[in-house]
């Protein structure tokens, strides 16, 4: 016949089964601690049982050491039969089981552990000290096969004094023993809406070695165990009546936090313990690095802060929202001891609290208990939960004082609040990011860098006195529909060849921006992407040079100190520093022998109209500079490029008879210039043109050529 002995020697009233060898062995599920409320009961897969009842079940495993050892002398306690069975034994039989001397107890200890050293007589050691040491060794042995996950949840209606760091609330002592997998300690006869005074959630499993440590005899003799620091779990399902909306504490032993440096590599394992009772020294912590609320140094700081107030029975640092969301900037700093966080990822804050219990307790548990965020089942996160990810905006700094008592973190306002609502305040990434131009700024300053009507020489003149990076974009004279980019660089490449009349030390480089259905693209640069507009092209190249020799500098004023598009012919000096250009229709070239002036232009136009077949016009770019006139065939049909030096020019003007050329059913003015023949030095050739676009009138180029010829005659 098996008997049950419950003794204070077993640290908190844990039950042990002593079975004779001639009878079938029976083991009992552990009874809850006497500190639990009377309405609590223990639920297993076999059904509900009263709190005080112990139901024997068959034990299939090998007998434990305590079952084979002699009985222990202790105070007799009451024995509770299971329902439907009679009381086991008589008082005389019970006395025979527990009536042992001190020598018998010492003999039993030596059989359990031959290395155990007995206390000498007369040192004041008591029988309780020896029994406590025996129990410590027993707990150490059982920790190899027992893994209990215990979550202690207390009500939000806790007594708070002097802010959130001094919150005391009733605690629940976890039962010790081998619980069945899936065992759940719930409260009955209490509505689910109000069931938040003191509740516990227990998960048991045999998945690895626990982190239990034997209790030293000195600590076991203390009349009252030390206060355990705690980390609060917010009661999301109920309204908090405390001033700061504190949740229930998640208790952890101080001795565990001292060992965090040694246990840090084990956080990634499946061993998961969550709480510790003041009665027993079973310390718990999270078993997955993805669910850690703090790093090791943060836990050490919280432990030191909690030990400063020993008057409270269960100190609470902050609520979960304050811990995970309102983290101080010091928590993001690297720990002083590198071994505390070695072998595990750093998790500055907890994962977000998702809606519909996506990353919290299962619905069956949540319906009967408060919402516990990020519950780990057997040390692993729930399916669907992802590790916390920090956005780049949150990596720089956090506003100090976000978790001050006067401004508590609003993490416990609603069940569906996530980290996106947390009061994170990000600092700008630096002056470099603030100075990066925006599309609006680029478009607003386009009047300074986009000059469609200027020529290549004008662009060079505008950028000659500017700093490296200055640029200007104009319409390309060689490729119709494309754009020319003039950019001032710091040094001229060795392969660059100087154009006629240009300085070899010129720092202005020219690039072609092609335009197509895909967008604008820098010609010859395959690594360059296509941009939807010139503004996008300029904005991107002002941030990153890409294929250009340097980044573009957005101008905020007129380049060259004046409006380079104005082509005034008031003085010869101003004409020498300017150039003009436009698109025109090239008609033909007619030899006028020795004629010059307006008569030569009149004769050439008359000869052209007298032909049976009129010439086919070609679009060319007419450019006038100090060096002369340069013609560029846009379509490359008649010629590629022709240059007429200023010394060969004789006259440039409109038709004296003001005749017009019919272009696409629209008349356009005809003009021409007279130059020496390149084959016959004694003859002159008149080159005829017609205006191509009303926006680009021929009067500008005609006036500039006339002014240049006048200056050449004076010289």
From Swiss-Prot:
Residues 291-325 have a biased composition (Low complexity). Residues 159-183, 195-251, 291-364, 376-435 are annotated as: Disordered. Residues 197-206 have a biased composition (Polar residues). Residues 449-556 form the SH2 domain. Residues 1-18 form the signal peptide. Residues 582-705 form the PTB domain. Expressed at low levels in colon (at protein level). Expressed in prostate and placenta. Interacts (via SH2 domain) with Rho GTPase-activating protein DLC1 (via C-terminus); the interaction is independent of DLC1 tyrosine phosphorylation. Interacts with integrin ITGB1; the interaction displaces tensin TNS3 from the ITGB1 cytoplasmic tail and promotes ITGB1 stability. Interacts (via SH2 domain) with E3 ubiquitin-protein ligase CBL (phosphorylated on 'Tyr-774'); the interaction is enhanced in the presence of EGF and reduces interaction of CBL with EGFR. PANTHER family: TENSIN, TENSIN-4. This is Tensin-4.
């Amino acid at each position: 016949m098996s008997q049950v002995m419950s003794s204070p020697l077993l640290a908190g009233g844990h039950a042990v089964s002593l079975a004779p060898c001639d009878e079938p062995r029976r083991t009992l599920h552990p009874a809850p601690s006497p500190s639990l409320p009377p309405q609590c009961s223990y639920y297993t897969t076999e059904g509900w049982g009263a709190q005080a009842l112990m139901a024997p079940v068959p034990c299939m495993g090998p007998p434990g050491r305590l079952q084979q050892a002699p009985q222990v002398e202790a105070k007799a306690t009451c024995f509770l039969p299971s329902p439907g069975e009679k009381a086991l034994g008589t008082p005389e039989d019970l006395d025979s089981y527990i009536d042992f001397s001190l020598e018998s107890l010492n003999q039993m200890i030596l059989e359990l552990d031959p290395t155990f050293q007995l206390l000498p007589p007369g040192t004041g050691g008591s029988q309780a000290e020896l029994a406590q040491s025996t129990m410590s060794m027993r707990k150490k042995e059982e920790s190899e096969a027992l893994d209990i996950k215990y979550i202690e949840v207390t009500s939000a209606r806790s007594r708070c004094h002097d802010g959130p760091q001094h919150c005391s609330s009733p605690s629940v002592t976890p039962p010790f023993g081998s619980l069945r997998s899936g065992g759940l300690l719930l409260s009955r006869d209490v509505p689910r809406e109000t069931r938040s005074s003191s509740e516990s959630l227990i998960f048991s499993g045999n998945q690895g070695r626990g982190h239990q440590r034997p209790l030293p005899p000195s600590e076991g003799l203390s009349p009252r165990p030390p206060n355990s620091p705690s980390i609060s779990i917010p009661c999301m399902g109920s309204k908090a009546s405390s001033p700061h909306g504190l949740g229930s504490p998640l208790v952890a032993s101080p001795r565990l936090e001292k060992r965090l440096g040694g246990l840090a590599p084990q956080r990634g394992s499946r061993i998961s313990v969550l709480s510790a009772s003041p009665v027993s020294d079973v310390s718990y912590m999270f078993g997955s690095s993805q669910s850690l609320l703090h790093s090791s140094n943060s836990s050490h700081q919280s432990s030191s802060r909690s030990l400063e107030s020993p008057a409270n029975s269960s100190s609470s640092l902050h609520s979960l929202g304050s811990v995970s969301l309102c983290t101080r900037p010091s928590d993001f700093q690297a720990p002083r001891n590198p071994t505390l966080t070695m072998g595990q990822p750093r998790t500055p804050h907890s994962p977000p609290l998702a809606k519909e219990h996506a990353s919290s307790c299962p619905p069956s548990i949540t319906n009967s208990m408060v919402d516990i965020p990020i519950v780990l089942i057997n040390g692993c996160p729930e399916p669907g939960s992802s590790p916390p990810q920090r956005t780049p905006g949150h990596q720089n700094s956090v506003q100090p004082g976000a978790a001050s008592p006067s401004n508590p973190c609003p993490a416990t306002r609603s069940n569906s609040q996530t980290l996106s609502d947390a009061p994170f305040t990000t600092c700008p990434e630096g002056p470099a990011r603030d100075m990066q131009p925006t599309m609006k700024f680029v478009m607003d300053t386009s009047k300074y860098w986009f000059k469609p009507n200027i020529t290549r020489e004008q662009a060079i003149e505008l950028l000659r006195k500017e700093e490296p990076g200055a640029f200007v974009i104009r319409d390309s004279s060689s490729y119709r529909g494309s754009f020319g980019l003039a950019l001032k660089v710091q040094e001229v490449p060795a392969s660059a060849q100087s154009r006629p009349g240009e300085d070899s030390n010129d720092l202005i480089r020219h690039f072609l921006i092609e335009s197509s259905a895909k967008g604008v693209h820098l010609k010859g640069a395959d690594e360059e992407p296509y941009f939807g507009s010139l503004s996008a092209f300029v904005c991107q190249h002002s941030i990153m040079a890409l294929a250009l020799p340097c980044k573009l500098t957005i101008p905020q004023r007129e380049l060259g100190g004046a409006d380079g598009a104005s082509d005034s012919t008031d003085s010869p000096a101003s004409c020498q520093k300017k150039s003009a250009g436009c698109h025109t229709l090239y008609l033909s070239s007619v030899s006028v022998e020795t004629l010059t002036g307006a008569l030569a232009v009149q004769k050439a136009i008359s000869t052209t109209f007298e032909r049976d077949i009129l010439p086919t016009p070609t679009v060319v770019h007419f450019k006038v500079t100090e060096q002369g006139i340069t013609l560029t065939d846009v379509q490359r049909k008649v010629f590629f490029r022709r240059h007429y030096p200023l010394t060969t020019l004789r006259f440039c003007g409109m038709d004296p008879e003001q005749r017009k050329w019919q272009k696409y059913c629209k008349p356009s003015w005809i003009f021409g210039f007279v130059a020496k023949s390149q084959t016959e030095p004694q003859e002159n050739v008149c080159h005829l043109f017609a205006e191509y676009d009303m926006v680009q009138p021929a009067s500008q180029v005609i006036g500039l050529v006339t002014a240049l010829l006048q200056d050449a005659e004076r010289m």
